Amino acid sequence: MTMRIVLYGDSMTEYLHTPPRVLAGLLQDQNPEKTFELLNYGVGATRAELVLYRLRYEFWHGRQRMLPLPVLQPAALVLESCAFNNSNDQAAGLENFTRIWDEILETGRELAPHARLIFLVTIASSPQPPAEMANRLFFHAGPEIFANRHHWREIYQERFIEWARRRGVDLVNVRQAVQSAEAAGTPRTHWIAADGVHPNPAGVEKISAAIAQNISAHILKKAETT
């Protein structure tokens, strides 16, 4: 029986490719007896509110038709925090951010009661201004602009982690894994692109490996108890 996995999020998820081939390859290598269908519903500039919308309603992204949860009935949902986009609201939006995630959790359980819900926080952004050629949206902005954006991204990612722990949900914390690697001497730039935000190929591998490890561990645990 095919295991359908759907990924929701912003451009951090969209960068995992459509379909997410690195994740698909890792899952197949780790679970050769299983068949997987992976759908990447990550869309750039998505806020948590739009994840909530897409769980309930059909959505078109270019030529990609994204079906609502009652139609999909996946085995697993990977729900990325969207912290970077919601962080534009700064202090005024923090309570709304966690309220929306409460609604996402409730909606996921309601519309896909048999699905496993996996919550994802990705690699932190860089506080430094990006390379000029990669800096299209904030061309020639001062370093204080990037420091401020990074500051609020950090706060929103941390708030998401706090929320996930408080709710007792399944959390894949790539941010923490990268911080541990940084402490051991590997710079964050090893995993992020020249824009200082999105994952480069090594980052895609890092995020995909963390998701695959979580899903494969659950498959193994389920097999041992049946």
Where are these regions (language model features)?
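Extracellular cell-wall/glycan-interacting regions and their flexible linkers
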Residues: 1, 225-226
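Serine-esterase "nucleophile elbow" of acetyl-processing enzymes
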Residues: 1-44, 49, 67-71, 77
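Short, solvent-exposed loop/turn segments at secondary-structure boundaries
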Residues: 18, 51-53, 89-94
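Alpha-helical cap/lid subdomain in secreted, periplasmic
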Residues: 25, 58-224
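Acidic/histidine-rich helix-loop elements
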Residues: 40-60, 196
